[in-house]
Amino acid sequence: MSKMASSIFATFSLLSSLLPTSLASSDANYEDFLQCLDLYSQNSIPVYTRNTSSYTSILESTIKNLVFLSPTTPKPNFIVTPMQESHVQTSVICCRMHGLQMRIRSGGHDFEGLSYVSNVPFVVLDLIHLKTINVDIEENSAWVQTGATIGELYYRIAEKVGVHAFPAGLCPTVGVGGHISGAGYGVLMRKYGVSADHVIDARIVNVDGEILDRESMGEDLFWAIRGGGGASFGVILAWKIRLVPVPPTVTIFIVPKTLEEGATALLHKWQFIGDNVHEDLFIGLSMRSVIISPKGDKTILVSFIGLFLGGSDKLVQHMEQSFPELGVKPHDCIEMSWIKSTVVFGVFSNDASLSVLLDRKNPFPPKSYHKVKSDYVTEPLPISVLEGICHRFLKNGVNKAEIIMSPYGGRMNEISESEIAFPHRKGNLYKINYIAEWEEAGSMENHLSWIRELYRYMTPYVSKSPRSSYLNFKDIDLGQTKNGTATYSQAKAWGSKYFKNNFKRLMQVKTKVDPNNFFCNEQGIPPFSS
């Protein structure tokens, strides 16, 4: 940063305590906001107003949930797409100066739209251009900017060497900013834990417009942004991550079973196996309904999805010893490189090229109307409960619902609940993701009622005190406050579910680094009242 820029930011820091503590007055002078961006930046910052021809296309470009593309959805006053770190600093400064709330978007996969929707005057800070990835194989690490996608990260790692990986999710278009700050599940979780377990440094812009790294932010804030949701504390610019070793060959399998083929009994058996098999083996599953006749008759399809860090011969041996009922045979297994497996799981095609990982317009999964929820299971579900789930999936009018179950065990059981802000560790058998999708806006209420009724049905059979949820499967039904003005007791409604006993410490960190709650949203971490 030049001396002039440094002086500007220093001046702002001195004046920051004089800025208003509340956001978004109705008489905010938005022209002054644009002038502020020019004043505090030495080069032009891309900014789009509602009168800009490309405003709508940029706003909608990464929105995955069609629920938030309706004409009645509140739209930002401005979209800022920073090209460099100083643009982020300037944006924070000018939003604070001119009473505009900031929503921070990296990949646009926020299930509740909180990264790009607000009910007060606001700016979307779209980090899509901050996507540089520098891989250092000698150090087994990489710096990845927050606007990069998981697919891009995977591709750049494999470009350097074929026996390193990073434990993260399946969908290649998810942005690393939100994914890692919310924890980051994937098929390597039993071997290596979640993405946030492998963050060794970070760069963040704080409420005063300063860029901090791990040393300058301190260990409390560094702890909080690993699993606690970075958007409550600042703007994550980049993560330094530790890479993990993988063998040259991994093996995958996908074994589908219908109700008629004994899917319910196999699912029940899986509950006693998934968290106990060797940590090199991940066996997850997906449950959905499928139409099997022209008359619309349906059945349930349960797909058992496996990844093994090794060859198919050894995988088949493991399966014969631990889960012979599933009947995995050599012809069910496909050997490939780890990077190829990310393509297969990411787009469910064995024919797609590796370059699909770089395609931000990848149509899989397609944009849709959807609602999600999550649970953690600590005791195996009885057969009768699984049958009750199946019965609900066969309900008419709900054809695109899905449940995904991800097993625990292995490394997930070895890390303390308080090691990072993400708390869901030992004691869980598996995590459940519930997903309801629909194709027409008019079907929303039917599908919302369906998923909420299923969630209520599951109440006696999942984790308790609190009933836990996964932050990256954000669920506004857990509770919210408008404009991020929650008290401790209000925020505990969702905070205890996402963060368990770590919630109070997260609020303590928030109170220290952002006492006036500039970085806020409907389910953010609020500060303790002064």
From Swiss-Prot:
It comes from Berberis wilsoniae (Mrs Wilson's barberry). Its cofactor is FAD. Residues 72-246 form the FAD-binding PCMH-type domain. Disulfide bonds join C36-C94. Pfam families: BBE (PF08031), FAD_binding_4 (PF01565). Gene3D superfamilies: 3.30.465.10, 3.40.462.20, Uridine Diphospho-n-acetylenolpyruvylglucosamine Reductase, domain 2 (3.30.43.10). This is Tetrahydroberberine oxidase. GO terms for molecular function: FAD binding; tetrahydroberberine oxidase activity.
